[in-house]
């Protein structure tokens, strides 16, 4: 990557949660730099964690001064979070046109999980203005950036031994109905929330052990999938909660003796947990996942459950994060402890599906033979282990601190320690 296609931010604390704002900033058409807004969260082993919104320096700050006098990013707003956030996400792009009952039209929402589901409101009511010269140098106010806690939803556990909600591991925000969020928990449950009314719609025991991640089927308000410590990927339909569909189970290890203490007929030997699940937004038949401590990424097809249709092998250490771009091209980014970000173009490997067959679990089965892919189309070597990544929406071309201009398109943000880098794809 060249200096013209990379931006960097050094946070005051180790970064864990990371997400790119998906809705246009006020004035974004006139000021492309304002679309660079990232939500980030800290990870420290105490009750003093924080979340923050960071953005690029505004063009109007840089009118008279040399671009290189300023860091790329600045903190726009921040708030205390207590325990670390296990996940942080901005509202979906569709939320800006959603009929909210308790939200200002000009504000944007963030959500975090940890000891509870928290919904935050980010506002930028007061435009940033440049004041007169002070001491021969232009100064600027901080603008009206505010990040305030809107709702805390701790929930109640279905598990008999729990009187209060157990810690939440992750969540998924529904794109079609942004008032819906589904959370996953270490107490084996998933809970569907209506954040507009601050109520739990339903809670179900989803797995035999901890649930680590959850994702809505794109385009659906009823179907979601989850992965967990029991090594399974399961699909649930809110219209029929009596049963779930097991789409994939990690292979049981060889030469492991069966459990000795009168196991139930459904007991399985210990298997490798699945940590993350992510749908391809361009074709929701396809999902990506990876095992705990695993260096391979499995690509699964809902039309062909049971085994991966693709396996991506190029990382040299455990994978920590993955994410699909929002374009029609199925571009997948993966990152891990080998200090690498790899981009995979899977267009030539995927079964083409028509619009009518998308989002259907009973579509015709494609050829289920697993393809092993070991040639990413792009690689970026970082200075340390990468713990998180986030794709941007489409962003217009803009002037960099060097004075050069970037092409329009997507950016990819990665987190490693206290550093965040934004890479032009």
Model feature map: region roles:
Residues 20-26, 31-35, 89-106, 171-178, ...:
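Loop/turn segments within WD40 beta-propeller blades
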Residues 7-50, 84-87:
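Beta-strand-rich domains and repeat architectures in extracellular enzymes and scaffolds
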Residues 2-10, 60-89, 96, 121-172, ...:
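Inter-blade linker and blade-boundary elements of WD-repeat/beta-propeller domains
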Residues 50, 116-119, 188-191, 232-234, ...:
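A conserved positional marker within WD40/Gbeta-like beta-propeller blades
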Residues 41-44, 112-115, 183-187, 227-230, ...:
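Conserved strand-to-loop turn within each blade of WD40 beta-propeller repeats
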Residues 51-59:
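Beta-propeller blade signature
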Residues 398-425:
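Blade-level signature of beta-propeller repeat domains, shared across WD40, Kelch, NHL, RCC1
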């Amino acid at each position: 990557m060249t200096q013209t296609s990379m931006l960097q931010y050094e946070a005051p604390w180790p970064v864990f949660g990371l997400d790119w704002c998906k809705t246009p900033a006020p004035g974004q058409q006139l000021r492309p730099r304002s679309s660079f807004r990232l939500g980030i969260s800290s990870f420290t082993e105490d009750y003093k964690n924080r979340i923050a919104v960071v953005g690029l320096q505004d063009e109007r700050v840089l009118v008279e001064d040399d671009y290189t006098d300023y860091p790329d990013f600045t903190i726009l707003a921040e708030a205390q979070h207590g325990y670390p956030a296990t996940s942080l996400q901005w509202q979906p792009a569709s939320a800006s046109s959603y009929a909210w009952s308790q939200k200002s039209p000009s504000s944007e929402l963030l959500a975090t999980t940890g000891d509870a589901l928290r919904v935050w409101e980010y506002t930028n009511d007061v435009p940033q203005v440049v004041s007169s010269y002070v001491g021969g140098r232009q100064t600027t106010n901080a603008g009206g950036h505010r990040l305030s806690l809107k709702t805390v939803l701790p929930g109640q556990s279905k598990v008999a031994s729990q009187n209060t909600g157990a810690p939440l591991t992750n969540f998924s925000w529904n794109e079609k109905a942004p008032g819906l969020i589904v959370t996953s928990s270490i107490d084996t449950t998933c809970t569907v929330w209506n954040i507009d009314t601050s109520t739990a719609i339903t809670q179900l025991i989803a797995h035999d052990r901890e649930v680590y991640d959850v994702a809505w089927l794109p385009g659906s308000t009823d179907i979601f999938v989850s992965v967990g410590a029991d090594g399974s990927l399961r699909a649930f339909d809110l219209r029929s909660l009596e049963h779930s569909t097991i789409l994939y189970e990690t292979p049981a290890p060889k030469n492991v003796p069966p459990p000795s203490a009168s196991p139930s007929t459904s007991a399985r030997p210990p298997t490798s947990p699945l940590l993350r699940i992510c749908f391809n937004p361009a074709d929701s038949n396809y999902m990506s996942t990876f095992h705990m401590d695993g260096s391979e990424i499995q690509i699964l097809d809902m039309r062909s459950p049971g085994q991966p249709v693709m396996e991506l092998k190029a990382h040299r250490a455990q994978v920590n994060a993955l994410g699909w771009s929002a374009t029609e091209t199925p571009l997948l980014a993966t990152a891990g402890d080998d200090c690498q970000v790899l981009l995979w173009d899977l267009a030539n490997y995927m079964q083409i599906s028509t619009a009518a067959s998308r989002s259907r679990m009973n579509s015709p089965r494609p050829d289920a033979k697993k393809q092993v892919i070991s040639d990413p189309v792009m690689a970026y070597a970082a200075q340390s282990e990468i713990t998180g990544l986030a794709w941007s929406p489409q962003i217009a071309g803009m002037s960099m601190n060097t004075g050069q201009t970037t092409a329009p398109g997507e950016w990819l943000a990665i987190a490693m320690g206290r550093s965040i880098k934004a890479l032009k794809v």
